Amino acid sequence: IERFGAHAVVLATGGYGNVFFLSTNAMGCNGSAAWQAYKRGAMFGNPCFVQIHPTCIPVHGDQQSKLTLMSESLRNDGRVWVPKKLEDAKKLQAGTLNPNDIPDEDRDFYLERRYPAFGNLVPRDVASRAAKERCDAGFGVNNTGKAVFLDFKYAIDRLGRHTIEERYGNLFQMYEKITAVDPYNNPMMIYPAIHYSMGGLWVDYNLMTTIPGLYAIGECNFSDHGANRLGASALMQGLADGYFILPYTIGDYLAHDIQTPKIKTNTPEFDAAEKNVTDHLRRLYDIKGTKSPDHFHKMLGHIMWDYIGMAREAEGLKKAIKMIAELKEEFYKDLRVTGEFTAMNNELEKAGRVADFIDIAHLMALDALDRNESCGGHFRLESVTEEGEAKRDDEHYQYVSVWEYKGDNKEPELHK
């Protein structure tokens, strides 16, 4: 444990998508920095707004720790489909039918059918929910039933293989290396996965949190994307926050401290902070239970995906809140951390991350339960149109949900 003192601190630590265990996020990406700031006075905005990406390589086993994103550009030329006949889907799931043997008239190009004006280029949340609906109805195309086809046969016939190679060659190569399936001659399989956190630490127009001198930029703040990020706009936010805004606003803040000497770390405040961290780590290490941090992370991921994933409802969210509380209780009773306490210990670090994820999950569920409307990446089954699409309620919910930490085992306070 090391001490650092600073006149100002910038968090650029990414999102909290790995609360779902499986996501497209890097393995080292976690919500711990933002969460610890939240517990020390920085407010958290819109935690329930997370984006699910429609074009990811499907889950293919119990030992995966990460999902692979296939670029959304593939939907420019690929056509998304599942079989029209349930018996064909069952054969695909059993591995007894080649998708190339299904004639066009027996293929359901469901995005083109439902959204003729947009076809396969509908927004990410729409494409993701549509894929889930088809798979939930039994039309999934792999052995888990959790995949749909993204087919380039028609684009190759129309444009030629050379053009498709020029546009997507690196993506096709990556797909074949991972799946051992040639996407030039066979349709890709895709399925939605957690991708981006629109929620994050609340910041003002200067990118400062509610803790003076603490800034949050990029995905770890809530500021730019509302309820649903558009493709490539994370790059825009990185440029806006890190290049155009922060150098000026943090400079203005530091100008008032120009005469302040170097921050000393041998103070009672630093002593208390270090003791708090050490005590927490020692508590985790000394549980001496039977289950690994990964076990609890996977269990949390199942709860999140099932009840706080693409489609949410009050009953499921209330159930999730109860299940998360039960998981937290079990975590602090039956966690086992291997290795030495005083040495570099990846399992102990992981345990700390999972402890934070469990608390983040609770806040996400509270926020999703409070927002009884469908908006962007947040889809409530109680708030849909006659066609089954998202139905917003701007009269009652056109606000940023800003949550304030009130202490361990206490409900946070919502500011609108």
Q: Predicted segments — roles?
A:
Residues 252-343:
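Long, amphipathic alpha-helical stalk/connector segments used for oligomerization, subunit docking
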Residues 330-416:
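C-terminal amphipathic alpha-helical interaction region
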Residues 51-60, 189-197, 258-280, 377-389:
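A glycine-rich phosphate-binding loop feature that marks nucleotide/adenosyl-phosphate handling sites
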Residues 8-63, 67, 225-248:
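Glycine-rich loop(s) and the adjacent beta-strand/alpha-helix scaffold that form part
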Residues 1-8, 210:
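Core beta-strand elements of the Rossmann-like FAD/NAD(P) dinucleotide-binding domain
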Residues 107, 222, 235-244, 368-383:
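Conserved phosphate/anionic-ligand binding catalytic regions in large, soluble enzymes, centered on
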Residues 194-216, 220-221:
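FAD-binding beta-loop-beta segment adjacent to the flavin cofactor pocket
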Residues 36, 43-177, 248-251:
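An anion/pyrophosphate-binding glycine-rich loop and adjacent beta-alpha core
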